[in-house]
């Protein structure tokens, strides 16, 4: 019965042994939340899983570079290796061109080229020949001192770091194209997201947001994703007397400050947004500066250099496009905008607004996905 082998992402592999072990432990724990693992072992940079579950789910587990189905065997001579591979793969290469690649660790009376050559000679009569550049079948061997693994097909993982390995962030999550993609990108870096949504579109918006979160949950290694819903209409009602051209920036500052308070409460050490430089008037460089002024947490904007088409393409890859494309834009507070705001004027208007952020969070509805 085959086993499943996987290689952690290259960024994990190059870390110190102590850090690497920590990331590997979290990765293995996350894998166990996605598929049933009967047992596992760490083998010189490779994780070997014994599972009878659908291992294709590993394609959405961050921290994995490659995963593949392997056959394990023991040997005491080069002929033992050749016999095992010949018996296992003689029908696989039938009518096809093949190549053999060998990686070897240990002290042996033979080298990797010897093994590849002998296996090639043994399989040649069953095949259409050897093609080292573009084979139909590539037979890969990983050899240790007296045992090894053999496999033919590698599958790509999403790489990155395991979700939950690098901290938490509060995401300003509107549910449009941008914020789900930004969330996914932080998850790829090992971050566990806490989503903060200001409801401006009622049940339609909420239902679509929750469907997007269901998609993101597939990438979270089944770690819970918490969504805090805040009544956005209660917030916008406080802006009716504010300068119309500054209302959008004032609303964004309220969102940032709410995220800051929530982050401090939940021991998250950053805020994440889906903002892209100059995509809209509120996202010019000066307006981003004004928006995050005096926010004492790092603000991550993973999409800052992406254009809208690139973001939409990523949403298709992730799986959130279907729901993001149905979400209307809610512009309920002002038809005016300003591309170059003045900090002192924004702060002057802000001082006129009375908001108790602790109370705002206390009234928020928490949905755990």
Swiss-Prot record:
Superkingdom assignment: Archaea
Domain THUMP: 52-154
Main location per the UniProt record: cytoplasm
EC assignment: 2.8.1.4
Cross-referenced SUPFAM superfamilies: Adenine nucleotide alpha hydrolases-like, THUMP domain-like
Molecular function terms from GO: ATP binding; CCA tRNA nucleotidyltransferase activity; tRNA binding; tRNA-uracil-4 sulfurtransferase activity
CDD domains assigned: THUMP_ThiI (cd11716)
InterPro entries (UniProt xref): Rossmann-like_a/b/a_fold, ThiI_AANH, ThiI_fer, THUMP_dom, THUMP_ThiI, tRNA_STrfase, tRNA_sulfurtransferase_ThiI
Location relative to the cell: Cytoplasm
Pathway this chain belongs to: Cofactor biosynthesis; thiamine diphosphate biosynthesis
RNA-binding keyword on record: yes
Cross-referenced Pfam families: ThiI, ThiI_fer, THUMP
UniProt similarity note: Belongs to the ThiI family.
Function: Catalyzes the ATP-dependent transfer of a sulfur to tRNA to produce 4-thiouridine in position 8 of tRNAs, which functions as a near-UV photosensor. Also catalyzes the transfer of sulfur to the sulfur carrier protein ThiS, forming ThiS-thiocarboxylate. This is a step in the synthesis of thiazole, in the thiamine biosynthesis pathway. The sulfur is donated as persulfide by IscS.
Protein name: Probable tRNA sulfurtransferase
Organism of derivation: Sulfolobus acidocaldarius (strain ATCC 33909 / DSM 639 / JCM 8929 / NBRC 15157 / NCIMB 11770)
